[in-house]
Amino acid sequence: MPLPPRLAYALLIVSACSAPDSRIPALDGSLALEIRYPRPGEAAPAEDSVALWGTVGTGRAKLMVNRVRVNVEPNGTFSSFLALPPGRSPSLRFVAHRGNDSVVRTILLRRGTPNSSADEGTPVSEGTVREWGRWVTMRRLLSDTADRATHLRPIYSRWRPGGEVAIPIPQGVRLFANARTDRSIRLRLASDEQVWVPLADADTTARARPMLLRAGPPQLRSDSTEMLISLALPERLPSTVELSGDRLLWTVYGAEWTTRPASRDGDSAPIRRIVPRNAAPGRVVVDVGLVSLPLGWRTEWREGALHLRVRRAPLPSKSLHGLVVALDPGHPPDGTTGPSGLSEDSVTLAVALVAADKLRQRGATVILTRTSGRPLSLEARAVVAEQSRAHLFISLHLNAPGPGRPPSAVYGTQTYWMNANGSALARLLLVEVSKAMGQPAIGMYQGEFAVLRPAWTAAALVEGSGIVIPEREAFLRTQAGIDTYAQGVVNGIVRWNRAADARALPVSRRR
């Protein structure tokens, strides 16, 4: 139940005026007001409150924002959550003073809407949807020559222009576009399924082909590390792989079997049985029954066939010898800056380097997505996850509150997973990082992150702590803070490697 406006406002004032944190080292510098957040022109959420953080340069200064006193920590930093004045263009007036010296800044904001996103376009905003009949080849333009990962990644289609991600479509695939807007085209995948992609990612000079291509029967091969299921096809087609309880459902679009191939048994774990079926005109499914949770899976095209590679999970072990771990220090570009100016990307790199050293001492092989402050795109990080031989992929981050949420909301550790093979890793990292950092475990969540899309490894994203909280930022400035975060990551990996339940299949969903 929402709080009455006056009570909510009073609680915000009490929060802003809380006592200074004695764990933060004192700093007696010059008066210098630096507002890290919000930035001028920032969209103010419809909740009518805004988080703010920054520094006044000295712990001996006082700060007022819109005539509300905001607590200044011993090192001069501040972090608070204040009500906004009404109107379409609210403002925040900061007044910092120490003795006879004072600094005044005004931040102009613009009113936003609840749960809004600048990326959330619609067909209407792109112009009228009109019929279109043309074969196209998916091909992304290489816009950044410094980052050649772009041409290796699929194009992620959406259920509507600017909407939720649908399925990945490999570059080079030829599909039929039956409608378009000014900037997007609609692709026919099957008789009952279609998706949207940017027009810029399509070569519209493609030759026509039959609407449905005949697929060969599934062929199975295996070795000590993986199993390979292959479908012969005249050319590459888009496909998806979904883990549903104790089954992997491999759906291939634009294919058909004139006679359904026979089912067959798998020869060993993790595959129990393979059942092919025509799901709908233009969509075939290879239903792969599982004995245990695979380490990962991916599809690839080579030698005239579409292949599903299913990795065997390593056996539980107390030793890390033979384990390959990919660590991804989150950002740059972007990333959050803490109240005193500590950058998220500098901390995540330091943590990754320490964690890598600790893991190598235990016998693991470690791959780092970056070893310097040079920006690296999400596409390039995802390529490392999918092209490497890593068993685990862990993306390291620090947290900041979303619009309309107070800084206190990120006091603790959060983890994210996307594919089910990363769920156990996310759970164990949540427990161990929060325990090491001496802070709450906020929770683990399933999230759609670009770096977690590849299912080839068990992958998780860790928000180790809230960098916008002055005490946490001050701790992360120290070597002890870096070592502590890194040790929590290592402990989570060690527990994953030992745990038999990390290889357990998720509970089956009823169909």
Model-predicted regions and their roles:
Residues 395, 402, 414-416, 445-511:
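Active-site-adjacent mobile loop/cap segments within catalytic or ligand-binding domains
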